[in-house]
Each structure stands twice: as structure tokens, then as C-alpha cells.
């Protein structure tokens, strides 16, 4: 996948209006990243000085260690993958954005490692499914698949976990550290959104089918990874269904942005239906027998009934609207 020569033609590009807009956005990702660089050593040291080293019961400490060791290794994978992207992306603007991400991911990895050391718990080995998600993305030679795996799957999962753990205020140092990560990861997702539509538009029918199969395999492995983390997540008060709801909303936003850039992007592709059915099978909306769970998952895939993704997302949206209404009423007085 690596290039053995310099891309001397990177400036000989005649952009369409859409391509020029994407280029400006990617260049902006780079410059915003430069403006918002933060020193991980100083930030973590200041937070520990303010709150003291993390103090948690053994059960919560073990759970946080398991969850964020997955994040830590994901950051290392992201570091390696963003370096690969920097080499193979040809447009200058995309190369700049990917270069900015390399620096971000290096910082994310060493700061998370330092936090886990402060937590005082040896990070456990990765579970099979988490390792599979990272390995699939690292191993593929397809730029489109790397962007899908890194920018739009691994980064989205990380953002989802960061948001929910921060909302629950599980541990004060982590609660104040995670917004730095979230801000960076949101930019990284933006790079994938700008680059991937053009790559998909150039694919043959067979290549799109292969891409869809990879997409489903990757997402299925990610959900199985979440299932593996379920005991640890519930130990710190995180309902995996809430993560699915946040992830579903983020993915819906990404799909909407994709359709803006690539109008023929399908509204409800088959892999999305299968993914919804798998989520219903593993995280059912109600306690039922195994047979009923399978039948419910099939109905969700056929869009005959809403599944856990839609139901939990609607619940979360309703709670957010209720909180905003209460805030407005309280503010009025």
C-alpha cells in the first residue's frame, strides 16, 4: 500500500466545485488541529493535581481498565493507520489532514497509557472481537476500507464510549480528560466523510458489493466487541444499549453527510438492516426466549418493527428534549 515515489502530480489537479469544497474542508481540518493542539503531559498532570490519582473500588477500577485498554490499543492502531493514510492519500489537503491525525493519535495513545498507569491496574489483553476490528482495518490494502474502518467505525465507537462515560462522571480525572479526545476524534471522522464518497463513486458494482460485505463484517465484529465489554460497562453504570443509541445517531448523521456529498448513497442499505438485526439479537429490547429473540431480529431486518437501535435512540432524544424543556422553564424563573 505504501508509495515508493513522491506524488509529484499532487498539484496538477483540476477540482470540480464539489471537490474544491471537500479540499477546503480537509485543509481546515489540518489548520484547526494545529490551533487546538494540547500537551497531554501537562493536561493529565494538572487534572491529577486537581483531583488526585483515581480512587475507585476494585470492581470499577478493573472495569475502567478493561474498557480503556481497548481504547488505548485502538489509539495505537489509529496512529499506525493514519500514518499509512498520510502516505497513500494524494491530494495535498487530505495528506495534511491525515498528518495532523498522526500527531493526535500518538498523543492519545501515550496519554491513555499514562492514565491507565495512574489508575493502578494492569491493562488486560484485548478480547477476540476488539482485536479483530483493529486487525481487519490494519490489514486491508484498500484505502476506502481503511477509511471506513478507521475514520467511520473505530473513531465513532471511541467517540460514543467517551461521550457516555463522560456523561456519567465515573471518575473526575477521566471526565475532564475525555473532552480533549472527543474534540480531536470528531475532526478525524470528518476526514473520512470528505474522502470516502469520491472513492466509493469510482467503484465497480463488484467492488461496492465487496465493500458492503467488509462494512457488515466490521460492524458485526464491533457489536460483538461491545457484547464482550458488557460486564465491564454495566459495572460502571453504562447500559450498552445507550452506546448503541449514541452510535446509531452518530452513524445516521454520517450517512446524512454522505448523501449530501454522494447523492446515490442508499438510505437503507442491506448491511445496515443486517446490523440492526444483529443488535436486536445481542441486545434485545425485551427479555424473551431465544426463539422469540431470533424472530424479533428477523422482523427488525425486514423493517417490520423497530429494533433496539431505533427504540433506544428515540428514548435518548426524548430525554434530551425533556431536559432542554426543564432547563428552559427553570431559566424562565
Name the predicted role of every residue range.
Residues 95, 99-102, 175, 179:
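Short, well-structured alpha-helical segments
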Residues 1-96, 117-125, 129, 141, ...:
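Terminal targeting/low-complexity segments that flank the catalytic cores of oxidoreductases
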Residues 71-79, 101-116, 151-159, 181-192, ...:
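Alpha-helical transition-metal enzyme core signature, strongest for iron centers
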Residues 109-166:
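Active-site-adjacent scaffolding segments
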Residues 161-226:
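Aromatic-anchored, glycine/proline-accented short structural segments
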Residues 42-45, 136, 170:
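Short linear motifs at secondary-structure transitions and domain/linker junctions
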Amino acid at each position: 500500500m505504501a508509495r515508493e515515489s513522491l506524488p509529484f502530480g499532487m498539484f496538477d489537479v483540476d477540482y470540480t466545485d464539489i471537490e474544491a469544497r471537500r479540499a477546503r474542508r480537509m485543509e481546515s481540518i489540518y489548520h484547526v488541529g494545529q490551533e487546538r493542539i494540547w500537551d497531554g503531559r501537562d493536561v493529565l498532570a494538572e487534572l491529577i493535581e486537581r483531583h488526585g490519582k483515581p480512587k475507585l473500588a476494585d470492581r470499577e477500577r478493573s472495569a475502567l481498565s478493561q474498557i480503556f485498554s481497548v481504547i488505548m490499543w485502538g489509539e495505537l492502531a489509529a496512529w499506525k493507520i493514519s500514518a499509512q493514510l498520510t502516505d497513500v492519500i494524494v491530494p495535498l489537503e487530505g495528506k495534511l489532514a491525515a498528518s495532523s491525525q498522526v500527531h493526535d493519535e500518538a498523543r492519545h495513545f501515550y496519554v491513555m497509557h499514562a492514565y491507565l498507569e495512574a489508575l493502578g491496574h494492569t491493562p488486560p489483553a484485548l478480547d477476540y472481537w476488539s482485536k479483530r476490528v483493529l486487525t481487519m482495518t490494519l490489514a486491508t490494502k484498500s484505502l476506502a476500507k481503511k477509511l471506513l474502518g478507521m475514520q467511520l467505525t473505530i473513531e465513532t465507537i471511541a467517540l460514543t464510549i467517551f461521550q457516555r462515560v463522560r456523561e456519567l462522571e465515573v471518575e473526575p480525572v477521566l471526565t475532564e480528560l475525555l473532552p480533549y479526545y472527543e474534540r480531536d476524534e470528531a475532526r478525524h471522522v470528518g476526514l473520512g466523510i470528505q474522502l470516502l464518497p469520491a472513492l466509493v463513486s469510482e467503484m465497480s458494482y463488484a467492488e461496492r458489493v465487496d465493500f458492503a460485505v467488509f462494512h457488515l463484517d466490521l460492524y458485526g465484529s464491533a457489536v460483538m466487541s461491545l457484547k464482550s465489554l458488557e460486564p465491564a460497562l454495566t459495572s460502571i453504570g453504562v447500559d450498552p444499549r445507550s452506546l448503541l443509541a449514541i452510535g446509531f445517531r452518530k452513524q445516521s448523521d454520517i450517512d446524512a453527510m454522505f448523501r449530501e456529498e454522494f447523492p446515490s448513497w442508499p438510505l437503507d442499505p442491506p448491511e445496515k438492516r443486517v446490523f440492526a438485526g444483529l443488535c436486536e439479537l445481542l441486545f434485545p429490547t425485551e427479555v424473551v426466549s431465544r426463539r422469540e429473540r431470533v424472530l424479533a431480529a428477523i422482523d427488525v431486518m425486514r423493517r417490520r418493527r423497530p429494533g433496539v437501535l431505533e427504540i433506544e435512540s428515540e428514548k435518548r432524544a426524548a430525554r434530551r428534549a425533556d431536559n432542554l424543556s426543564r432547563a428552559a422553564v427553570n431559566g424562565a424563573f
